[in-house]
Amino acid sequence: MNQSDNLVKTWLLGYVDAWDQFWFTPRLPHALSILRIITGVMLLYSHLVLATDLSAFLGDTAWVNNETARQLHDGTFGLSDYGRTYLWFISSPTLLWIHHGFTIAVTACFALGLLTRITSPLAWFLQLMYLHRLTGTLFGFDQILTYMAMYLMLAPSGSCYSVDAWLRKRFASTDRGRFWNWLFPEAKATVLANIATRLMQLHLCVIYLFGGISKARGQTWWDGTAVWYSVSNYEYQSLDMTWLSGYPRVFSAMTHITLFWEIFYCALVWPRLTRPFVITLAVVVHAGIALALGMITFGIMMIAANMIFISPGWVQHIVVRLRRRSQQDDG
């Protein structure tokens, strides 16, 4: 009995240790900082696109006006949800432009890594307000941007490859207190960086799992024609791939491989043995979506999201090598 108790105790302690190691082992922020740059640039691009015809998206004269947008969330047309935004109540074009200019400025600072501790939560909050207002004009690109911005604000994503890092180095000789150290954190391993990384990894696994299960409900994913129907659809087609019609075994294999990969991504991405193959396939799939189906921004963001499984030490090594090569070329 004592031996059995010891075995159970050892197993439980091992489980607790593994849990602690998974969540609370300090991690370098370098991969998160690269993701901050990509997410910030794509957020900036998204807001600049809105600025090309702002009145068509926001205000009382928009395609979906303020009142209709509010009713889509408050239960008028169905179940009420928690999607709320103050943009429902702004009708003045001047105020909307001032607000949008502020949003663009904040997003640009977030991308550059300027006052990231402040601009990262602001960029996420403003994006969420737009997300709740623009019901009916959203796509997966917007959702991926929002969840990545949400987790990046939890971590010191501006501690390297940023204006914040330059400012900290520039004034390194002066000890300015706790607030300064919080505002301009060092590029060192932290628990928060690891927690943000794990949350992003798990979120991505959930996205792929439910995406794969949803695909499995469709007959075309079982009979092998889903990829063909996708690339032959003129509504999305940006690259003529109709030549695949002459190779049914090819597009059938592509269909079944994609379905298998998406459903089992959440299991196969964790072991080091299978991770390179899973990530490589993710790049191939999303690059194909970007080039063949015209969803370039979505493809870029999904490839970027998969970077969260790349070791920050490896990212740091690559950046250092690129800098050295650049310096050698300049010399």
Regions found by a protein language model. Give the residues of each.
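Alpha-helical membrane-anchoring segments
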Residues: 1-331
